[in-house]
Amino acid sequence: MNVFLRAATALLATSLSLQAGAADAAAPAASTPASAASFQDKCQAPTVDRAANRACAVALWRHAEVERTAGRNDAALAALARGDQFSPDDLRFAMAHASLSLKLASQLTPAGIEAAAKASPGDAGLAMMHAELSIAKRDFAAALADVDGVLAKRPDAPLAWEMRATADVARPDFAAARTDIDQVLRLEPRSPVSLRLRGLMRNNSGDYAGALADYQAARALAPRPEDPFIIGSTQFLQRQFGDAAATLATRTPPAPDGTYWRLWRYLALARLEGVERASGALGPGTPPGTGVPWPGPVVDFLHGSIDAATLLDIARKSQEAHDVSQVCEAHFYMAEDALLRQHGDAIALFRQAASECPRNFHEYEGAVSELKAAAATAPAGTTVSDASAAR
C-alpha cells in the first residue's frame, strides 16, 4: 500500500473545504501577541524587525478569521493579503486567500482550481492548491512545476519544500525527496509532515529505529488517523511483533484501508502465537459470490479459502483496473504465508515483491526487512537461498 498517494487524495479534499483547509488552520504561533485594537496602528507595513512582522502576521490571520466568520469576506481577503506581505514564507496566507476567493466565486472545485491557476500563474496560493490537485491526480511533473515556481520567488517557504517532498516521495524519487526534506527541517524542524516523510526514507535505508522515532515525534506534534498503521508496521520491521500487534489494534479504520491494518496485525500475532491462534485477527473472509475491494482477497487467501493462483489472478485484474501494484502486494503476502507455514520458497517470493513493489510501499519495506532478517539468521557458509531450500 502507498500511504502517501492515499493521503494525497485527502489533500485534495482539504483544498476543497475552507473549514478543513488553510484558511481555517491553526493560527500561527506568535511570540509577541497583538490585540485587535492595537495591531492596525502597529502593522502598517513590514519592517526589518522579523519578530514584529511575525506578530503582525498572526494578528492579521486572526483578524481575517473574525471578518470571515462575520461574513465580511472582502475584509477577510484584505487581511490575508496583508498577512502574506508580513510573512511571505508562510504560504498559509496565500493559500487561504486563494481558497476563500475561489469559494466566494463558487469555483472551489478541481476545474475551478485548474482554471484559476492557469489564469494567474504568479499566484503562490493558487499554485500550491494546483500542486495538491496534481499530486492527487498523480501528475507529479505538474505538481513539481507549480512548486518550483513558488520556490523561485519564496525559497524559504517550508510548505513549498514540503509539497515538493511529498511529490518526490509519491513518484518515487527518494534522492530528490531527501534534499527536499532536509530543506524543510532546516526551516521548520518540527514539521510533522516532513518528519513522517523522513521516517519513510529511514525505513527504506534500514534505519527502523530512526524511522520509528520520526513517526512517534510527528504523532506527538500532530496526530494523524494513519499513524498507528505507520508506527505499527515499522515496529514489525524492527521485529517488535508484540508492540506492532498492540499498535495496529488501535482505531482500525473501515475497509479497504483497515484491511491492511488487520493483515499486518495478523502477521505480527502469527509470529508470536502461530497462524491458527492469530487467524482471528484477520476477521471474516469474503462471503461466497461477493466481490470486495483489494486487499480483501488477501484475507481469503490467508484463511485458506482461495489458493495462490486465484489470489494472483484477482491481483492482476485489480491492478489492471486501478494501476496500484496489487500483484507485488500479493507476492509479499504469499511470501509471509509461506514463511509462517514453512512451505514453498518464501525467499523467492520476498525477492519478487522487493523487485516489483514501488519503494514507497509498505510491502516493499516488509520484503526487504524479511530478506535482511533471513540473511542474518542463515547458517554460516550458506546463502539465504540455501537456507530456504533446506526447509
Give the predicted meaning of each segment.
Residues 68, 102, 135, 169, ...:
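Position-specific recognition of the canonical hydrophobic site in helix A of tetratricopeptide repeat
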Residues 62, 96, 129, 163, ...:
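Canonical tetratricopeptide repeat
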Residues 50, 57, 91-92, 124-125, ...:
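Helix-start (N-cap) detector for alpha-helical repeat units in TPR-like alpha-solenoids
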Residues 52, 86, 119-120, 153, ...:
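Structural marker of alpha-solenoid helical repeat scaffolds
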Residues 49, 83, 115-116, 149-150, ...:
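Canonical positions in the second alpha-helix
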Residues 71, 104-105, 138, 172, ...:
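Residue-level detector of the short coil/turn that links helix A to helix B
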Residues 98-102, 128-132, 165-170, 193, ...:
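Alpha-helical adaptor scaffolds
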